[in-house]
Every structure is written in structure tokens, then in C-alpha cells.
Amino acid sequence: MKKITLILLSLLLGVSMAAEKKILVVYYSRADENYSVGNISKGNTEIIAEMIAKKTGGTLLHVEPAKEYPKGYDDCINVAKKELAQDARPAIKPVNVNPEEFDEIYVGYPVWWGEMPMPMFTFFEKYNMKGKTINTFVTHEGSGLSGVARLKKVTGANVTAGLAIYGHVAQNERDKAQKEVDKWVK
């Protein structure tokens, strides 16, 4: 009887483990000179993405433009504003995982003029996210949780409005940012 119980328990655990969701934390983030926090070595959104990946056990995927943005803030925003005005789709570097193989996706980006940075649109137009669950998180300095409606339209996914954290909090008050992440990610 004990052997049968052990076998059944093993089978149940195996089924339970097989049913776990594969989680991806995909984000765009920019270091260098940033609004409000100056020159930084790690972008605000990257800091939050790492917290979420650690909390969920998810795989990190950094979306990177093939051509880096200028390091200076003013030069960067000039390029980014032009991309937005042209609805550009800048080339991105190849990624090391297939995002289509994941069940649940956390998507993070800094809010630039009420939108995701344009390399994120390139990413989402390249990969099929239809039917997936996307949980959004953003860093900002006053725009709040922006870009979600357009993300729904571009992906066809079940996009949830999620977490908005000030960039200066992500950068300079990491304990506070971690508490916000912990409260949001269940």
C-alpha cells in the first residue's frame, strides 16, 4: 500500500511540475544619461525587470536596438522623438530565447512621450503573442502606466495594466521599489 501511495504521489508531483507556467520577463532599458537620475550604469527598467525575474523565477530578455541610442540625454531624446514621429521600427539585436514558447510574459519599458520605446514595437511585431498573458510594468517620471492600449493592439494578447514605478525610485530607493514589485507580483 505504501508503494502505491508513493507512486501516486510521485505522479501527482510530476503532473503539478509539468503544469507550471513558463515565465518571460522582456524589457527595454537604457543606462547612460537619464532624466532625473543623471548618468547611470544600469537602466531603471532593468532594475525592476531583475526584481520581477527573481520573484517569479522567470527568464530575462533584454530587447536591444541594433544601433545604440546616443549616451547623452538630449541627443537620445532627439533620436527617440524622431522615431516616434515616424512610427519607426528600428532594428533590434537577435534574442537568445524564443518568446513564443512562454506562457506568461512580463513586459517592461520606460515611458517615452506616453509610449513604449520604438524597439519594443519592433520586437512585438516580430513575435506572435496572440492569446498570451502580458503583465506590463513601466518606469516613468510622471507619465504613469502609459502605452498599454497600443500594446494590446500590437500584440493581440491579454494585456493587463500593471505596475508603474518612478525611475528615480527604481534607481535610488530600491527597497521601496522592491516592496512595490513584491506587492504586485503574487
Regions found by a protein language model. Give the residues of each.
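Positively charged n-region of N-terminal signal peptides that target proteins for export
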Residues: 1-4
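Hydrophobic h-region of N-terminal signal peptides that target proteins for export
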Residues: 9-17
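N-terminal beta1-alpha1-beta2 submodule of the flavodoxin-like/Rossmannoid cofactor-binding fold
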Residues: 19-102, 179-186
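Second-shell loop/turn segments in exported
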Residues: 33-39, 107-110, 135-141, 167-171
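Solvent-exposed, acidic/flexible segments
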Residues: 38-42, 113, 117, 141-144, ...
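Conserved beta-strand segments of alpha/beta enzyme cores
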Residues: 57-59, 158-161
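Helix-loop-strand module that forms the ligand-binding subsite of alpha/beta enzymes
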Residues: 70-158
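Glycine-rich phosphate/pyrophosphate-binding loop and the adjoining helix
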Residues: 160-186
